[in-house]
Amino acid sequence: MDDPKQTLPAAIRKWHEIAQTGDRSALDALLAPDVVFESPVVHTPQRGKAIAATYLSAAIVVLGGAEFRYVAEWVGPKSAALEFVTLIDGIEINGVDIIGWNADDHIDRFKVMVRPLKAIQILHQKMAEALSR
């Protein structure tokens, strides 16, 4: 049987590989230099590959445990929405990654939305801890 991920756009396939393996070193090759990252816990968009990679690396550590999984996806020509669920300290987190990519298949937009409020609060705490290391 064919792997359904093989039919996904290259940027989304690569993101799935990173999310699944936790290989944060692969972010540099995947992110566009002018990528914009929008976090559910930071008011302003974060612009540029270095800062986006920092936030995404922390998110992979915080969210990417054994409980993390994508449960649905909607894919368009240059963007996708990936719904995920995970568990942190007994709190169920439900979120959506909205990802855009350029003609070179580099991610140029990454927005994370999370619910419920308890999830945002624990995510804020854990991200602050991860970013301070």
Where is each model-derived feature located?
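A beta-strand edge to alpha-helix "cap/lid" segment located at domain peripheries
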Residues: 2-3, 57-133
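Compositionally biased, intrinsically disordered low-complexity segments
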Residues: 15, 44-45, 117
